[in-house]
Amino acid sequence: MEWIINQLRDHPELAIFLTLFAGFWLGRFKIGKFSLGTVTSVLLVGVLVGQLNISVDGPMKAVFFLLFLFAVGYKVGPQFFRGLKKDGLPQVGFAVLMCIVSLIAPWILAKIMGYHVGEAAGLLAGSQTISAVIGVASDTINQLSISDAQKATFINAIPVAYAVTYIFGTAGSAWILASLGPKMLGGLEKVKADCKELEAKMGTSEADEPGFYTALRPVVFRAYKIDNEWFGKGKTVSELENYLVENDKRLFVERVRQKGVIEEVTPDMLLQPGDEVVLSGRREYAIGEEDWIGPEVIDAQLLDFPAETLPVMVTHRTFAGEKVSTIRALKFMHGVSIRSIKRAGINVPVLAQTVIDSGDILELTGTKLEVETAAKQMGYIDRPTNQTDMIFVGLGILLGGLVGALAIHLGGIPISLSTSGGALIAGLVFGWLRSKHPTFGGIPEPSLWVLNNVGLNMFIAVVGIAAGPSFVTGFKEVGFSLFIVGALATAIPLLSGLLMGRYLFKFHPALTLGCTAGARTTTAALGAIQDALGSDTPALGYTVTYAVGNTLLIIWGVAIVLLM
C-alpha cells in the first residue's frame, strides 16, 4: 500500500485517473431515484485522494476546463442566438430574470451568514448545480489584489461549499419542479390535462395516450395483400394515400407487386385486389391497417429494398420557423417521415404544430432516394463521423481566451471575463457559426461528450485533490447550516420562476415548468417533470432557457466574486 501511495505522489497524473475511475463508478449508484451524480462523486473521491498530500501542478486543470466550457457553448450556441429573435424573446426574458434571482438569492444568503467569497461562490455553484462556477470563480479570485494565502483559502473553500449544497441542488430541484410545481400551477391533474390539450392543439394527428413519446416512435415498413371491396375495380396509389391522410394516417406506398412482378410505384398506378403493397410510416399508423386493406404478408423479397435514416441539420432559411405540418405537406417529403427532432441535444416532441428552428437536427426516415432528396432540400446531411475539427476547436479556444484575458480597471480592480469566460463565449459563437455553415467545425456527439464530461471531471478531480488537505477543516467551519442555506438558495429561484411563468409571462403550465428547468440547466428535473406529467411538451420551453441559463450562470462565477 505504501508503494502505491508513493507512486501516486511521484506520478500525480495517476492520482487523477484513480479519481476519475472511482468517481465515475460511484456516480453510477442510485438510492431510489437519487444519485450523487458523476461530478459530485469525482469531487468527493478527489478529496479523499487529496488526503495523501498529492501535489498536482501545471496547466492541465485549466486546459481541460477550457475544453469543457468551449463544448458547453458550442452545444447551446445555435439556440442561444435563435432565442434572441422576436418570437424567442419572452423565454429569453424569463431566463434572464430567473438567472438574476439565482445570483441574488445565494449572494444575499451568503451576506446574511457572513460567508467569505469562496464559500459564497461554492454556495452559488452547488445550489444552482452549475459546476463551471468553481473554475470561473477561482480564476476571478486569482485576479484579486489579495495575498496568495488568502487566495488559496478562498479557492479551497469553493469545493467544500459546493459539495455540501449540490445534493439538494440536484435532488431538491427535481422534487420542487416535478411535485410542487404542478400544484402551484393548478394541480397535477389539471396540468396533465393542459398538456394533453396542448398536444392536441399542436398536432391532432399524433396519438394521445398518456406517456406516449412521439419523438421516440420508430418508422416501419409493412406489406399487405389487398382484398378489400373498397378497392373495387381499382384505386390509384394517390387515391389510397389521400384516403389514409384524410383518416389521419400519414402512410405511403413504397412498393407494389402485381401478378408476381415488383413494379415501380407511380401516383397513378392502379391498385387492385390481389396486389401486394408495402406501406411506410410511423408504427402507430401502420399497425392495424390490415383490418381493411388486407392481411399482412411477410415477404423477404418484397421488403428487401434500401431504406435509410439520416440526421439532417436544418440550414435553409426557408424552413426555419415553419411548422412540422407545413414541412410534411411539401412535395419532396412524400414517403419521408420525421423520426425525431433534436434541439441543443434535447429531444423535442414531433407534433404537427412544432416549429422547426435553424440548427435543429431532424432524423428523416424512408427509402434511400426519397430521404436523400428531402435532406438536400432542407439542409446539411450530418452523417455520423469520428473526426473532430480540431483546427476549429483550437482556434475557438485561443481567440476566446485572448478576448477573455482583456481587462478593464474599475477603482483599481481589474475586471475581465477571464480566459474561461472567453472560451464559453467563443463556444457560443463557433457553435452558431457551425449551424449556419455546417461544412466545417464538426464535433461528433461522442467527441462532444468527451470534451464536456471528461473536460469538466478532469478539472473537478484536480480541484478535489488540491482541496483535500483542507477539506475537513473547511467543512467543520461551515457546518450543517450551510446545507439549509443551500436548500433555500435552490428553492427561492425555482419558486420565483414558477410564479413568474404563471403570472408575469402567462406561459402554458408545461412551458412554465420546462422554462424553469431550462433556466436552471437541470436536465434531471426536466426528466422528472416529463415523467410526472406523462408528456414531452415541457421540452418545448427548455431549450432556449437552457442556452441562456447555461451562459449566464457560468458568468455569475465572476459576478459573485465581485459582489462579495
From Swiss-Prot:
Q: Which parts pass through the membrane?
A: 12-29, 34-56, 63-82, 92-109, 116-138, 158-180, 391-413, 449-471, 478-500, 541-563
Q: What Gene Ontology terms describe where this protein resides (cellular component)?
A: plasma membrane
Q: Which PROSITE patterns match?
A: RCK_C
Q: Which UniProt keywords apply?
A: Cell membrane, Membrane, Transmembrane, Transmembrane helix, Transport
Q: Where is this protein found?
A: Cell membrane
Domain of life, per lineage: Bacteria
Membrane topology, as annotated, equals: Multi-pass membrane protein
A Pfam family recorded for this sequence = Asp-Al_Ex
RCK C-terminal domain ranges (all copies): 295-380
- Family membership, please give it: Belongs to the AAE transporter (TC 2.A.81) family.
State the NCBIfam families in the record.
Asp_Ala_antiprt, YidE_YbjL_dupl
- Name recorded for this polypeptide: Uncharacterized transporter BT_0736
- Please give the organism: Bacteroides thetaiotaomicron (strain ATCC 29148 / DSM 2079 / JCM 5827 / CCUG 10774 / NCTC 10582 / VPI-5482 / E50)
Q: What is the lineage of its organism?
A: Bacteria, Pseudomonadati, Bacteroidota, Bacteroidia, Bacteroidales
